[in-house]
């Protein structure tokens, strides 16, 4: 216990000059970093298509199985607020490697769990330490020469988005062939392997902020209060991610109950969402052309339309409409996120890491809300009501977006 005050109150030593650490990254190294981000963040989404299997296996009531997804995302949000700021205090390579080892242990705990309590606790641990992805991305940015930084970070972010999109079909297919516990055994092994690879590949990096951890944490509420862009963009993404998780937590239940889909069928359906990652580069190009604000509106409208289509798909018993809804919704959520991150990255560089963490935490707070609501609403009132609640979340974001237009004289990202 005596070590905790030291971490909280002791400023870090003055590090070596930052410029000395820049080097040319090889394509192989960049690819490994992208894979590492994708595999780590995927752990947050593995359970979404599996709740129909895991809930009965653990004896969870149908109205409570949303907690299977929610606690992982709550853990991730807390990790963004508490773990990621440590990257401004502690040596980064050690922090990333230790976090990946903790994720591996949490995944092993999930695989071995025989009760809801142990499963939930292990899920929280996985989410908490999977926030290491938001340490690794700026770490890689630091390693890249300034002239190559945008390209390198773009590739790594593509890996992260690919992990988000491919997690659901991967876990569905493995669960169908080897059982749901195998998903977490396999991922635990992958996390330990990644920890070893990154320990060998990453150089040591000591942050140069000179700030104490407690001071960094105390600065977070002030950043929220003083940064209008963060508040607005955080609300947009919280509403979008709530709708996203309502859809993706509820649709496996719909497919199993109304369409008699097995896990292989659900895996094939979830592949539709993977195409959403293709929208990220398009969003970046729109932002580079100065279209951040209108493109945000297009993304919000697209998400609204997608969820209306999802309602119709349930009523008309149409898998084709549900696939169309999945394609549009995933693309819209990714576009909104990329545009929002670009707006945030344009803000003060000395606060960029904390602003990024706060923004992603807002998104996952909304996502956890959607995941928690979805199974209970689906159980009590069906797909139509659930999808309409998703429509309302996106509508709330649209209302805030439209409220900006009377103030055209004031430029906002």
Mark where each language-model region is:
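C-terminal transmembrane helical hairpin of 12-TM major facilitator-type secondary transporters
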Residues: 293-340
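Conserved MFS/SLC helix-loop-helix module at the cytosolic interface between two early adjacent transmembrane helices
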Residues: 78-116
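A late C-terminal transmembrane helix in Major Facilitator Superfamily
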Residues: 346-383, 389-390
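Structural signature of the two symmetry-related core transmembrane helices
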Residues: 94-108, 188, 294-309, 391
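Helix-loop-helix hairpin linking two adjacent transmembrane segments in secondary transporters
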Residues: 118, 148, 154-202
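Helix-to-loop junctions at the C-terminal end of transmembrane segments
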Residues: 80-91, 279-292, 378
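Cytoplasmic helix-loop-helix junction between adjacent transmembrane helices
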Residues: 122-160
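Juxtamembrane intracellular "pre-TM" segments in multi-pass secondary transporters
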Residues: 15-24, 202-235
């Amino acid at each position: 216990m005596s070590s905790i005050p030291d971490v909280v109150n002791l400023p870090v030593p003055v590090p070596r000059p930052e410029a000395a650490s820049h080097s040319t990254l090889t394509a192989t190294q960049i690819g490994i970093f992208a894979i590492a981000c994708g595999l780590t963040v995927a752990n947050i989404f593995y359970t979404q298509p599996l709740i129909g299997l895991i809930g009965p296996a653990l004896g969870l009531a149908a109205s409570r199985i949303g907690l299977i997804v929610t606690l992982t995302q709550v853990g991730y949000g807390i990790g963004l607020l508490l773990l990621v700021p440590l990257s401004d205090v502690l040596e980064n390579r050690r922090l990333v490697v230790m976090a990946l080892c903790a994720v591996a242990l949490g995944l092993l705990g999930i695989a071995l769990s025989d009760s809801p309590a142990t499963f939930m606790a292990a899920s929280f641990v996985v989410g908490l330490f999977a926030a290491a992805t938001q340490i690794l991305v700026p770490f890689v940015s630091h390693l890249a020469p300034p002239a190559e930084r945008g390209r390198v970070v773009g590739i790594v972010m593509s890996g992260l988005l690919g992990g988000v999109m491919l997690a659901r079909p991967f876990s569905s297919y493995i669960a169908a062939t080897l059982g749901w516990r195998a998903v977490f055994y396999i991922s635990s092994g992958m996390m330990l392997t990644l920890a070893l690879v990154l320990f060998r590949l990453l150089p040591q990096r000591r942050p140069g902020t000179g700030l104490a951890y407690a001071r960094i944490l105390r600065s977070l509420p002030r950043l929220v209060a003083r940064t209008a862009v963060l508040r607005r963009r955080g609300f947009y993404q919280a509403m979008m991610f709530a709708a996203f998780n309502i859809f993706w937590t509820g649709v496996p239940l719909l497919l199993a109950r109304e369409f008699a889909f097995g896990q292989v069928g659900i895996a094939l359906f979830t592949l539709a969402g993977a195409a959403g990652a293709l929208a990220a580069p398009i969003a970046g190009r729109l932002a580079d052309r100065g279209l951040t604000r209108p493109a945000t509106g297009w993304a919000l409208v697209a998400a609204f339309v997608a969820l209306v289509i999802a309602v119709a798909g349930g009523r008309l018993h149409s898998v084709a409409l549900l696939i169309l809804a999945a394609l549009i919704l995933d693309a819209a959520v990714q576009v909104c996120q990329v545009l929002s991150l670009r707006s945030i990255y344009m803000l003060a560089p000395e606060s960029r890491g904390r602003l990024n963490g706060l923004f992603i935490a807002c998104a996952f707070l909304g996502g956890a809300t959607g995941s928690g609501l979805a199974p209970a609403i689906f159980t009590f009132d069906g797909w139509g009501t659930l999808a309409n609640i998703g429509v309302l979340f996106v509508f709330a974001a649209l209302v805030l977006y439209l409220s900006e237009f009377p103030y055209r004289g004031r430029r906002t990202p």
